[in-house]
Amino acid sequence: LSKLDVENGLRETFMEDNGSYTYKMVPMENNVWTQSFFTGIVAYMYYHYREQKYLDFLYGLFGYYEKNLYSHLEEIDHDAGFIHSLYAVAAYKITGDVKFQRMALKAADELGKRHHYESGVIASFCSLKDSKINMIADDVMNLQLIIWAHSETNHPFYERVYKKHAQAVINYIIRE
């Protein structure tokens, strides 16, 4: 991991038509939730090695993540908790820079708006106006962003959302 090259984008796996897998470098501008694995690793690399190139990379992505968040507010879905925990929250924790904190809190606010009060879940893909609210296993990743937001603000909104969502995860996702 110490040889991770942060200048060439992210290596993504693609399945070809013949069933074989290939690996290609893709730019960070491609809006894919899996890129947050990469930013999370880069944040960890900076935390562990304290090499400036990792911090520069995280700061260099700020505009991309900011644009992606604010230009797609109506499209926020279950990936938001994962994406922003591994980018904005991680960057805030290692830098203390409030611009990362603000971004993470905005993502938590938008994710919290997807909370369906009656069912207790943070809806995955559907509109909250739908008669059926969906939930998938990936929704567990939303908990860390909402719990973090509560720990930062102590706001009862976040506490209510994460407690109801956690109970919904226990009720609907976890099996014996």
Predicted region positions:
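Glycan-recognition and catalytic cores of secretory/periplasmic carbohydrate-active enzymes
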Residues: 1-176
